[in-house]
A protein has these predicted regions:
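Hydrophobic membrane-insertion alpha-helices, especially the h-region
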Residues: 20-34
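Long, hydrophobic alpha-helical segments that serve as membrane-spanning/inserting helices
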Residues: 1-15, 36-238
Length: 238
């Protein structure tokens, strides 16, 4: 009967297991770093895309801000002779020339419409966290200015416009002013100086608010241009 000698495998030293563990750890760690870097790059790219999109929104906004501003400037110009017209009307209720200009200049106003597609994405999709702190601050400041202006527009100025329109209905002859162009006939349907005075008081407030909104629009446009220059210099968008 043959007896086979058992083959003894040399026992591995602890250093062998240490190096195996270290290599495995490094492989996992490097994989984690690679994944982290990839996610970081993806988020950085997404953040830049938001900036580019917001930049395009600002280009639209500046164009529309200019149009609205010019509309208000035209109003203020057309309504600049309020005091002289008031004196003329009290002296002659048939005075038509100055009233025609005041009537046209106080009809309606340009609503400020801004492009908020990127802003909504930044807010609703958590996009603000992808922006650098200074970039996010610029976006938030501009958004606050826009929302503040639109709040004034839909409250204070709209109320002033509504009041003026209501008084105009009591004062002007529909048959003469219905097409926006004054035709022959008596322009006023009342000689009540109280109503005439109310109209000019409301008109005076309207002019003051128009001048105030010109300043606000100029500030908004200046802020938009500054942000565009800042982003363009930082990210070379154009």
């Amino acid at each position: 009967m043959e007896v086979h000698a058992h083959t003894h495998t040399a026992r591995k030293k602890w250093t062998h297991y240490f190096w195996e563990f270290l290599m495995l750890f490094l492989a996992v760690f490097c994989g984690f770093l690679a994944e982290y870097q990839l996610e970081h790059k993806i988020e950085k790219d997404r953040g830049k895309q938001y900036i580019i999109s917001f930049f395009q929104d600002l280009k639209y906004d500046t164009s529309h801000l200019t149009a609205v501003m010019n509309n208000y400037k035209e109003k203020v110009e057309n309504l600049s002779a309020i005091s002289k017209c008031y004196d003329s009307v009290l002296a002659n209720l048939l005075c038509k020339n100055c009233l025609s200009k005041l009537f046209k200049g106080s009809r309606g106003f340009f609503e400020l419409r801004t492009s908020d597609r990127t802003m909504q994405q930044l807010k609703n999709a958590g996009g603000l966290r992808l922006l650098k702190s200074a970039d996010a601050d610029s976006v938030i400041v501009y958004d606050n200015l826009i929302r503040g202006y639109k709040l004034d527009e839909t409250t204070t100025f709209q109320e002033t416009q509504t009041t003026l329109r209501s008084i105009s209905d009591e004062l002007f002859n529909y048959a003469v002013v219905k097409d926006g162009e004054f035709t022959d006939g008596d322009i006023l349907i009342t000689s009540d100086k109280l109503i005439i005075n109310k109209f000019f008081n409301a008109l005076n407030r309207y002019v003051k608010y128009s001048a105030l909104y010109i300043n606000k629009l100029e500030r908004l446009k200046s802020e938009a241009v500054n942000i565009m220059n800042y982003f363009n210099k930082k990210y070379h968008i154009e």
